[in-house]
Amino acid sequence: MAIDQITGHFMKYLCLVYYDENVINAMSPQEWESLNKECIACGDNLRSAGHFLGGNALQPVNTAATLRVRDGRPHVTDGPFAETKEQLAGFYLLEAENLDQVIQLAGKIPPARLGSIEIRPIRELQPD
């Protein structure tokens, strides 16, 4: 069992949802509505099982901005940092015993069928 050494709780994992927005844009309104309902049900199931800590879908990539601060000056560009086939579309913050368990949980996230889920363990920062 992977217990966070700082908090003493189960580990937290950020599950980043990626998919090709062109695939989503090609869906019929009924397919899109069905996918959204599946995502809501998935979140509800994860929450009732005590694994869901938070999450949300993101607006399309054309609404994004990237900020870089160089020499104390902000530089903003439209869009994401890098152009890729799959775009960051949402996230789930989950709590699980270990990586194996969170992989099983993330496999139930509906957009995993359409793209990918990147799973990242959370590193808790603690004040001195």
What are these regions (language model features)?
Residues 2-128:
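Conserved, structured core segments of small domains
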